């Protein structure tokens, strides 16, 4: 790999690892990121594993620093199951998205573009095409072609031609049992790429309407990525609506077949706890106490990962960033699109600023706001009404 030289001075760096295994490559890269004074502000590592990884704390590193990172990762992997999991580390500057399940299926659900790819040998040409869809021009890759017991892979003699036909350029001097290179197709990418590839928008100005849990969490996420965010709310203070209840319980949904709703809520509960642990005071604003759910039939179910939390405290913590400005006691009545920017207006028609992106997080109020805006925006209100 050509890291950390390649990421020097960058705002963010995304790595795709299709063979996460025991997480050792992630631990090595995380450690390199911590030590590098020119590291990117954000490191996003997407790892795909067929089963929940098992981290061997003692064998993962020869020193205390490495073992400390391994212990943190091992603790975050406890009680994880199939599906997608977002794990925040280093004050949320390092994001690990762990995808547990069939590698090809998981890869097909991704929509980002990676700067670096760490790959196992692909099973067929379709797998190579999935890798290409996760690339942008210049993305670097490193592929381990070591034969894996029981794995179905493309024969090593066919891989170079297959990769080149898909747009990859190969380095002439790769190590034994490995291929490396970059994605640099001869054709124009925008006209040959499916619309599922989302290009990250350059950080700019964003307006968010609504300062509850939804709006504050989006504001916090955008601010971490370098955006300047203004949050508007009709209440005087953030969390003035339902998000301002004195305390609440965060408990995952449970189903007999562990359906997507259950998996999503379980991952969401774990992610909420990570934010709370980083931003709030245990015992005062929240507590990972676990929750006992009493069933109507008289039974009970213990949720070890559940917690109680004061939502308003979390909202305030999310908004406490120099990149975020809160504007209260302000109603947004209309949106207007012009010159690729959005202008917000209050009920008196006063211009409240122009923004590259607007996020509506004002619950049922968004329908009325869309209807009161221009024709193109009103169409979105009609679509919303059908949901």
Kindly label every feature range from the protein language model.
Residues 2-5, 10-78:
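SAM cofactor-binding core of SAM-dependent methyltransferases
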Residues 59-109:
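S-adenosyl-L-methionine
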Residues 204-230:
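N-terminal Rossmann-like FAD-binding beta1-loop-alpha1 element of flavoenzymes
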Residues 224-244:
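Glycine-rich FAD pyrophosphate-binding loop
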Residues 239, 351-387:
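Central helical "cap/lid" subdomain
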Residues 328-343:
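A conserved short coil-to-beta-strand element within the FAD-binding core of flavoproteins
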């Amino acid at each position: 790999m050509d890291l950390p030289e390649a990421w020097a001075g960058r705002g963010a760096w995304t790595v795709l690892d299709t063979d996460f295994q025991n997480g050792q490559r992630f631990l090595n890269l995380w450690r390199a990121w911590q030590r590098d004074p020119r590291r990117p502000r954000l490191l996003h590592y997407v790892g795909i594993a067929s089963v929940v990884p098992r981290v061997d704390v003692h064998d993962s590193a020869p020193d205390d620093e490495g073992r400390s990172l391994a212990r943190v990762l091992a603790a975050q992997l406890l009680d994880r199951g199939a599906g997608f999991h977002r794990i925040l580390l280093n004050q949320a500057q390092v994001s690990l998205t762990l995808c547990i399940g069939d590698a090809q299926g998981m890869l097909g659900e991704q929509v980002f573009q990676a700067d670096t790819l760490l790959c196992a040998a692909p099973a067929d040409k379709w797998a190579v095409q999935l890798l290409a869809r996760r690339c942008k021009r210049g993305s670097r890759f490193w592929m381990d072609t070591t034969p894996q017991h029981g794995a179905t892979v493309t024969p090593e003699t066919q891989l170079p031609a297959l990769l080149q036909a898909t747009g990859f350029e190969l380095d002439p001097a790769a190590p034994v049992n490995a291929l490396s290179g970059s994605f640099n197709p001869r054709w124009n990418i925008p006209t040959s790429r499916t619309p599922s590839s989302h290009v990250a928008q350059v950080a700019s100005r964003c307006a968010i309407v609504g300062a509850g849990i939804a709006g504050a969490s989006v504001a916090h996420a955008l601010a971490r990525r370098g955006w300047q965010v203004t949050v508007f709310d009709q209440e005087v203070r953030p969390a003035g609506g339902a998000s301002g209840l004195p305390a609440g319980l965060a408990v995952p949904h449970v189903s007999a077949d562990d359906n997507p709703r259950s998996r999503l809520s379980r991952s969401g509960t774990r992610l909420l706890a990570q934010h709370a642990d980083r931003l709030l005071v245990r015992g005062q604003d929240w507590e990972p106490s676990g929750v006992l759910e009493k069933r109507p039939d008289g039974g009970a179910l213990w949720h070890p990962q559940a917690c109680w939390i004061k939502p308003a405290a979390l909202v305030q913590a999310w908004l406490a960033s120099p990149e975020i400005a809160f504007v209260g006691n302000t109603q947004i009545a209309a949106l207007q699109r012009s010159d690729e920017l959005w202008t917000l207006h209050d009920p008196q028609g006063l211009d409240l600023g122009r923004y590259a992106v607007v996020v509506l997080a004002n619950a049922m109020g968004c329908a009325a706001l869309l209807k009161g805006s221009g024709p193109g925006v009103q169409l979105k209100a009609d679509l919303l009404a059908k949901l």
